Amino acid sequence: MTATARKGGQTVTVKEAVVSGLQRRYRITAANAKPTVDYDTVVDTASGWLEWPATGQVSGTAKQIVTVVDSTKSGANARAKGEATLPAPTA
């Protein structure tokens, strides 16, 4: 998983495709506030997780962490997790 700078934000690329029956969500946090995600952790929108943008474009600040989770569509239970450090957006 990589994060590259773009004007006004970042583009996050996840090499692996989403497996059938799963959905992808993400959260951006400070490095010292990364979420703990284990197998079956609930990553629903009520818990602050966001739907994955088809473009992979997100908006954060330099050195924040983007955590990306593939989860079940029913119950939003985590199945896979990745993270990357965001670069500063370009001007």
Regions picked out by a protein language model, each given a short descriptive name:
Residues 49-63:
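Surface-exposed, short loops/turns at beta-strand junctions within beta-sandwich domains
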Residues 59-82:
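Beta-strand-rich modules
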Residues 85-91:
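Extracellular interdomain linker/stem segments of modular secreted and single-pass surface proteins
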